[in-house]
Amino acid sequence: MSIQELSTEQEVEMITCVIDGFEVTVPKGTLVIRAAEKLGIQIPRFCDHPLLEPAGACRQCLVDIEINGRAFPKPQASCTIPVEKGMVVKTQLTSPVADKAQKGIMELLLINHPLDCAVCDKGGECPLQNQAMSNGRSESRFEGEKRLFEKPIAISSQVLLDRERCVLCARCTRFSEQIAGDPFITLNERGALQQVGIYEDEPFDSYYSGNTVQICPVGALTGTSYRFRARPFDLISTNSACEHCASGCAMRTDVRRGKTLRRLAGEDSEVNEEWNCDKGRWAFKYEVAKNRITKPLIRDENGQLQEASWPEALAAAAAGLKDAKVGVLVGGRATVEDAYGYSKFARVALSTNNIDFRARTHSREELDFLASTPTTATYKDIDKADHVVLINFEPEDESPIIFLRIYKQFKKRAIKVSSIASFTSRGTQKLKAKLIKTAAGGEVAAINSITGLSEKSVVLVGERAAETPGALSAVAKLINNSGAKLGWIPRRAGEVGALAAGAVPDLLPGNRPIDNASARVDIATVWGSDSLPTTTGMSTLEIINSDLQAVVVGGVDPMDISPDAKVKLAKKFIVSFEIRQSDITEIAQVVFPVATVVEKSGSFMDWQGKVRKFEAAVEQSLNRSDVRILSMLADEIGNQLICQL
């Protein structure tokens, strides 16, 4: 447990100790190594990690300790011993004994460690390299042969293991068991034969396996997508946000020569802590896919898409949209800025409220629910919850970081978890959730049967609840009667932001109703428009089934649109904003290439409603954001659209 977590507990007893001659006061239970960090004293370590339970495996953090004048007979691992009253600690900085012990441990760790630094992916950011320099001997006394293993072993399609590099810190095995709940990797054998491996009869199967690569301190675990690709000092790192779900993970994107080489979990104690899922870590190859669209496309007289100039494409799109009845499908991949641009483009440039971000299954009841029943839950509420209810929501599949937060509290406090679903999933099984088994369409009765909720309870609702008439109304009633906190969790990263931006048929930005005259005047004033359309617009399904002549499609995942819907859309004039070729571009008359999240700055809004900003990682990209192209298209139509570019 971190100092921050300890200090937030009520009536925490504070303990004062002395480290290297300096007094420090910390909450009771704080480990010596954390107390030293508070003073700015860095004790070398490999197995220690602030989010994992202490193991004392590597012994690199040995220090001299005495309590009330009585000294321990030998140096102790500072990562396993909590601070006590009257404790005096001497680290390697003030104790020759501790310094000698640390140098001895380092020498033992290096006996069988290979000299792979020249080719190891960890080189340049390796704790073993750094601490061998700062806390090791300047010369090696070892003259024997180092232990050799076959290298590397592919323990999954994404993770490789070099066993001879491993220092047996057990970070990876503790993460798999304590954080992910997937014991997919373990320590085999004992003593000098001990090594990391996977279970013989069980596959290396986890949504979170990439975190073991990031926390490995020595390069024993490496990712296949980054192996032998670059050195840390060759990379330009940019803080970013994950675009794959509504969890809102902080990320770090590493780019070399204008190309993303890897993505790492960023640190945000209030959201993803220091973890992310494998999709967020490795699903970035679409940026350089072979079917990436880099130039505008126009369908010619023979029905083939041909490359065109920007003026030609803008003119063709404007001609098809200007005098037509139009709908706008935004999709859940759009950033907040782009969704706001589509919302403004529909109302100002096209004079219509026919706009919807829900390419998936949806309903009018869902819109009423989202407008009247806002999300009140946060990650902190999950951390304090006594009961978490999952309604048509599988957190491990749909929002992996929410699952980790629930699992953390399940391990810590054995909180109660209930799930309204048709079967027990792998994730709910790990949470030992109570299954309220429900056939499709029976959710209303199941929701009405839930009792015993309180203000400390959290109800998490997935987007699939919109498929059952009355389900979301039952959820609203449950929340009002119990006082429980509510979280609406869509699958896509952009859906919460699209709702806030007014990319729906009956709401303006800020969840203000279309039929509210005052709201229309306020928004029109901000947008510099004389007036806004007053008629409630069409939903996605209504747009597809209508007699509208044209549809603007952007940020939509093609997999969300059914084959029947694509057939109906093919009969309309389609203007597509797309990253790469898809089923939508195959039926479009005009296609505009748009920038990916690494090529533009912007923000997403996570399920809590928290804005997650990110900067462009590839600054020299020639690709334009959706909102910039919308501004150009609005100018071509004849309605000026000024949005943040």
Where are the model-predicted features located?
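Catalytic alpha/large subunits of respiratory electron-transfer oxidoreductases
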Residues: L110, P114, D162-E164, C169, ...
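Short, structural beta-strand-to-alpha-helix junction motif
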Residues: T30-R34, T335, S539, S625
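A basic, amphipathic helix-loop patch mediating RNA/tRNA/ribosome contacts
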Residues: V32-E66
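Extracellular/periplasmic ligand-binding modules, especially the Venus flytrap/periplasmic-binding
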Residues: Q620-L645
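Fe-S ferredoxin-like electron-transfer domains
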Residues: S2-T8, R59-E243, S247-M251, R256-R263
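Short, contiguous pre-domain boundary segments
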Residues: E11-D20, M87-V89, I293-E301
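Glycine/threonine-rich phosphate-binding loop and adjacent beta-strand/alpha-helix elements that clamp
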Residues: V598-V618
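Generic start-of-chain signal for non-secretory N-termini
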Residues: M1-L31
